[in-house]
Amino acid sequence: MRRILAGITMSLLACTAGLAQHKDPCTTAGTNNDWLGIQTVRLWPGDAPEAKGNACEDTPTLSIFSPHWGNGNGSAVIVMPGGGYVGLAGVHEGREFADWFTERGFHAFVLSYRLSSNGYLLPVPLLDARRAIQTVRARAQDYHIDPNRIVIIGFSAGGHLAALAATDPVPGNPEAEDAIDRVSSRPDYLVLGYPWIGALTTDTAHISYCKQFNVMDRCEALRLAYSPDLLVNKDTPPAFIFHTFTDQTVPVEQSLRFYNALVKAGVKSEMHIFANGPHGVGLGGVDPALEQWPNLLDAWLRAHGLLSPGGP
């Protein structure tokens, strides 16, 4: 009997060791992605569409953070960090916002999308954003969320991506073999922090996507296809936007351009411009006045019934 038990124990230890050795590095927090959640999943079970390889830089993921109490309030948020499409500000524009939302009863998801600096030019990051929204909606029952209470929030380049996802969604294909592809990628609410709306223009942008990634020869086509302010229509979800007057990286005019497009389309939205604050302020701890913007977001979420189970 002792020999049998010893054999079972050794087998279990071997299995455990094997699992430890075969952890997926793309979904496990490490030196370069320590902001990943304990539960992080690949957006596609195999290679992602347009993948150039199978390294982590080729693998979009979604980190999942549970609400601080019970099953939460039935709302979900997908966070899209900024980083100029060359990196991801996964802590102060990702994990910290996941914590902020889970404290309020949300299920939070942080998207790690593919970067243009790794050869993934638009629309590839948009494919990842759409898939993230579809994934959360398709699995709404698993997460105890309402599939019609999905918020997306993006900052800087992540704001450009979030605005694109909100203005250029795919409806879903009811006949698709993959259940995730059957549902719409349209978010229900949009939150933007100092968004790089003018990424594909040079009139007000201090940084040009086309120059940065050497695609000036097709910049006009990219501008027409991937400028969110040109894609706004009456079906665009209501938005909350904040920016600072002194942002030297992404001028406030870019948010104004998007907000004016929302007004023209009749989409009821809210915008706050603060006098002071640099680009990339996150939760706004650099200025006493700017620290208040999360409270304004809290009020906006509350007004839309997203902080209460069952809505308003």
Describe the predicted segments one by one.
Residues 81-86, 245:
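Active-site glycine-rich loops that stabilize anionic/oxyanionic intermediates
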Residues 241-243, 247:
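Short beta-strand/loop motif that positions the catalytic acidic residue
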Residues 131-205, 223-224:
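Primarily recognizes the serine-hydrolase "nucleophile elbow" in alpha/beta-hydrolase
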Residues 65, 242, 252, 256-312:
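C-terminal catalytic histidine-bearing segment of alpha/beta-hydrolase fold enzymes
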Residues 89-91, 95-97, 110-147, 287-290:
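Catalytic nucleophile-loop/oxyanion-hole region of alpha/beta-hydrolase
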Residues 23-71:
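N-terminal cap/lid segment of alpha/beta-hydrolase-fold proteins
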Residues 73-82:
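Short beta-strand element of the alpha/beta-hydrolase
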Residues 46, 179, 188, 195-231, ...:
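Mobile cap/lid helix-loop segments that gate and shape the active-site cleft of serine hydrolases
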